């Protein structure tokens, strides 16, 4: 999927209860917000930088959202079990948007 540069603000998150999700930075680095399974607060939000050529796997139940990038656009590979985006996807959101700095 193509990831475009956008403001570093997040509020919505998704999780998959039965499926891991792997994200691989193909043409440039990506930043991904993560939070522990269950209820979480903005203080428990973590942003990880994944450099070009590297990837990260998200265990079932871990909250995450679409990648961000420092570049104009990059390509990112997203890998999960077939039909996960229809059959094993749950959403939550924080009360207010949260910004992050590098």
Predicted regions mapped to residue ranges:
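Short, surface-exposed ligand- or partner-binding patches at beta-edge/loop junctions that are enriched
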Residues: 74-75
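Non-catalytic, conserved peripheral segments adjacent to functional cores
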Residues: 1-47, 71, 80, 85-88, ...
């Amino acid at each position: 999927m193509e990831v475009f540069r956008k403001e570093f603000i997040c509020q919505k998150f998704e999780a998959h209860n039965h499926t891991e999700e792997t994200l691989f930075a193909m043409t440039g680095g990506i930043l991904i917000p993560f939070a522990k399974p269950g209820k979480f607060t903005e203080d428990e939000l973590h942003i990880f930088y994944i450099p070009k050529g590297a990837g990260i796997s998200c265990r079932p139940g871990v909250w995450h959202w679409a990648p961000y990038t420092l570049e104009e656009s990059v390509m990112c590979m997203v890998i999960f079990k077939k039909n996960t985006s229809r059959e094993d996807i749950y959403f939550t959101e924080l009360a207010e948007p949260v910004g992050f700095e590098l």
